[in-house]
């Protein structure tokens, strides 16, 4: 009957509201974890532990891997650029896992720097966007998915904008600006396009 349908709708709306609130609270907790500024502030084990702590705040574990493999789409790392990745799988089997490529040419330097934590925050942002929008590539982001994801990581996970900009210099699809910040905020507010 109509009354039970209204009750069901109300219950679902409340569950969604609670889930979004929990997601945003976890993002804020991850952002609150202090990240040292300089490479030498921690040794590689310390940086990895810090990155793992940030991920675990979101209920995510980091898997180190030697080759790109996302749901059977394995093979060459596109342009050798991908250093970490998050897989969006229809069955949610990878929902709480992010991957770091230890074969990336810059892995040795990355493993000894705060850039590792920013990379993790970027991948966690893909996950948050996927949870909020049902996809890592929401319509609102258009062809700016990576830039919007970077903006999301800066605005809601506390990633370092300058460090990201320096590390990804010359890679246009990752370049943040006021518009990518606006789109990330819209997604965070529940507008996926």
Predicted segments, located by residue:
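Long, low-complexity, Ser/Thr/Pro- and Asp/Glu-rich intrinsically disordered
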Residues: 71-81, 98-100, 122, 151, ...
């Amino acid at each position: 009957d109509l009354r039970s349908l209204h009750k069901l709708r109300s219950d679902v709306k409340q569950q969604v509201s609670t889930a979004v609130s929990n997601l945003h609270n976890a993002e804020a907790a991850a952002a609150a974890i202090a990240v040292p500024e300089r490479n030498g502030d921690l040794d590689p084990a310390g940086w990895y532990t810090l990155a793992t702590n940030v991920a675990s705040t979101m209920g995510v574990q980091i898997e180190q891997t030697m080759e790109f493999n996302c749901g059977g789409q394995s093979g060459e790392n596109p342009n050798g650029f991908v250093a970490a990745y998050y897989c969006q799988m229809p069955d949610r089997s990878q929902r709480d896992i992010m991957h770091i490529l230890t074969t990336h040419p810059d892995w040795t330097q990355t493993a000894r720097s705060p850039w590792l934590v920013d990379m993790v925050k970027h991948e966690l942002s893909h996950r948050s966007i996927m949870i909020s929008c049902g996809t890592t590539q929401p319509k609102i982001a258009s062809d700016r998915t990576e830039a919007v994801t970077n903006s999301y990581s800066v605005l809601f996970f506390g990633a370092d904008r300058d460090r990201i900009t320096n590390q990804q210099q010359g890679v246009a699809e990752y370049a943040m600006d006021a518009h990518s910040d606006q789109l990330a905020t819209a997604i965070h507010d529940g507008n996926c396009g």
